[in-house]
UniProtKB/Swiss-Prot annotation:
This is Uncharacterized membrane protein YkoS. It comes from Bacillus subtilis (strain 168). The gene is ykoS. The chain crosses the membrane at residues 12-32, 97-119, 139-161, 188-208, 213-233, 277-297, 306-326, 348-368. It is found in: Cell membrane. Keywords: Cell membrane, Membrane, Transmembrane, Transmembrane helix. It is a multi-pass membrane protein. GO terms for cellular component: plasma membrane.
Length: 564
């Protein structure tokens, strides 16, 4: 009993240290506030501006057929997701940076405790293995996840804990509350659809091998799914009722041959994916491979060892599925069935962070059980993984490694306030577009834009907007394919700039041969163009440079052009 109490005390001590390190990790967001560096891709260039536009529009709880006039002359309200998502209300009640900091903290804390209770209850319950449970949980919580995903992947361990409890018949209000609340801070289509599909397969496996239905387990899966369908009622409505075709129906993603797909599967297996970064290559992967090789031909394997081998196979299987979703074999089915083109089923690989870190914990536990002479390796592996993850803190990654703008410098609110005041007209009375800049910057500052980055907008608008940039696309096959076969970035693409939208004020870049159809631009309501680089042949495009704007708190020099 005394030994058990000492173990519990040590575990509590480890927990407090881990929580301190976790809060230290997110502290720059609260200390630096708008002077913090955070992710640009699929974050500053999109989601953060979306939340602000939605909050400012007054359409958070708008009708299913409502539109947001600030973007592309009426972006469907459904493009911004559901009002039942907690992150929407964080951005409605707090400033953007404060909401972001809170969201990061909530997500990482829930991820930590979710993985911890999963490992303690179902994977590594042995009291003496507390260091493994807590160390791996902390590492999982520090992974550089996609910010607007919230708990879409980092919530998997907590959900799995609840489902495994229900599967065993160990049921309380906690499990049902967990399954009921997670849909309010995660995405169905960007995460939990794939997890719930996995749970359904797990239930089916039980039903076949154990010959029992386990209706409570099945009911819990149905319960969480029904909550998601309620939360995502806008998505359900759009699927059930006719509406104008959206640009996603023209997605073309299946281009790879078999060898390309195999190479991509290995790349994904070894390095992971940008939206679900696991940072497992240097420390975790070698350990997983060595333990896998040691167990593969072992006789009389234990249950934890068999579970470990299954997870390793599943790990590569998910990478293989991801890679082959872009293979040519899917080209015809995607053409015949629109939902296969519109919905990215490759995202089953979003399960990999859960699989990798549970596998890591199991591998360390199997090593730890080999005796005292091996425990040093366990401590070293956890410490090494935490050290590998430390530089992936956003402040270091984007501030030092990428030298990206701070939040304040990116959105440049004071500079764009000067532009708004200089124009001197109500912002809803004219439309703007940007060159060499993300449209989210203008959107964040209240301007009505003809360009945008959204994952859902009318196909007819894409066709109309394309007329503006048609000649530029013809000059650049990569940009043409990028816009025509994907098109979520509905930008004023310029051949000479390529896919760069971040020319800072110290850039020497110029545009010498711009060819825009400004007649179509004006017909759509366009009046001004914000460019981060000078356009040397502006007059040939019926554009006149009105003024250049600089500001000490901005990363950009804005050349304001007006149509003539």
């Amino acid at each position: 009993m005394l030994r058990l109490m000492r173990q519990q005390k040590k575990e509590t001590y480890y927990l407090w240290i881990a929580l301190f390190l976790l809060l230290l990790y997110v502290s720059p967001l609260f200390i630096l506030k708008e002077d913090a560096h955070i992710r640009v891709h699929d974050n500053l260039d999109s989601n953060i501006a979306w939340y602000k536009v939605l909050a400012d529009s007054g359409e958070i709880v708008g009708k299913v057929d409502a539109a947001i006039p600030q973007i592309i002359n009426g972006l469907p309200r459904d493009a911004f997701g559901t009002e039942w998502s907690g992150i929407v209300w964080l951005h409605a009640f707090f400033s953007s940076m404060t909401a972001y900091a809170i969201s990061q903290t909530v997500t990482r804390v829930v991820a930590f405790f979710g993985m911890y209770v999963l490992l303690k209850k179902h994977i590594i319950p042995e009291p003496k293995a507390a260091f493994i449970r807590i160390g791996v949980s902390l590492a999982f919580a520090l992974t550089p996840f996609w910010p607007s995903g919230m708990l879409s992947t980092l919530g998997y361990p907590l959900a799995l804990w609840a489902f495994l409890n229900i599967r065993k018949g160990d049921i309380s209000w906690r499990e049902w509350l967990t399954l009921g609340l997670l849909p309010l801070y995660s995405s169905f289509v960007l995460g939990f659809f794939f997890f719930l599909a996995g749970m359904a397969c797990f239930w089916l496996y039980d039903a076949i091998t154990k010959r029992r239905w386990n209706l409570m387990f099945l009911g819990s899966i149905a319960f969480m799914t029904s909550i998601y369908l309620f939360v995502e009622y806008r998505l359900v409505y759009s699927m059930l009722f006719e509406h104008a075709p959206m640009h996603r129906i023209e997605f073309i993603s299946s281009r790879h041959d078999v060898w390309h797909s195999l190479r991509l599967s290995i790349k994904n297996f070894v390095y992971g994916h940008n939206h679900v970064m696991t940072v497992h290559t240097v420390v975790i992967l070698p350990i997983l491979m060595v333990v896998f090789a040691a167990l593969l031909f072992k006789r009389n394997r234990t249950k934890p060892e068999n579970v470990y081998l299954f997870l390793c196979v599943l790990n590569y299987g998910l990478s293989l599925w991801y890679a082959f979703w872009f293979n040519k074999i899917w080209a015809v089915p995607k053409q015949k069935f629109a939902f296969l083109a519109e919905f990215n089923f490759a995202r089953f690989h979003f399960l990999r962070p859960l699989v990798i870190y549970v596998s890591f914990a199991l591998a360390l536990y199997l090593i730890w059980r080999m005796g005292k002479g091996w425990k040093w390796l366990v401590y070293a592996a956890v410490a090494a993984q935490l050290m590998v993850l430390a530089p992936f803190n956003e402040e270091y990654t984007y501030g030092v490694h990428y030298n990206a703008p701070t939040f304040r410098e990116f959105y440049a609110s004071e500079q764009f306030k000067e532009i708004k005041e200089y124009i001197g007209r109500p912002q809803d009375s004219y439309r703007v577009a940007s060159i060499g800049l993300h449209p989210s910057i203008a959107q964040y500052n209240g301007f009505y834009t003809l360009d945008t980055y959204n994952n859902l907008y009318p196909l007819s608008y894409k066709y109309e907007f394309r007329k503006i940039i048609e000649k530029e696309l013809e000059k650049n096959s990569r940009l043409k394919q990028y816009f025509d076969e994907w098109g979520s970035r509905c930008y004023l693409f310029v051949d000479e700039l390529g896919k760069r939208y971040d020319f800072k004020k110290n850039s020497k870049k110029t545009i010498n041969n711009l060819q825009l159809n400004t007649d179509v631009f004006k017909k759509m309501g366009g009046r001004y163009i914000f460019s981060s680089v000078p356009i040397m042949n502006a007059e040939q495009n019926h554009l006149a440079l009105v003024k250049t704007f600089d500001h000490k708190d901005s990363a950009w020099r804005i050349y304001l052009y007006e149509t003539r």
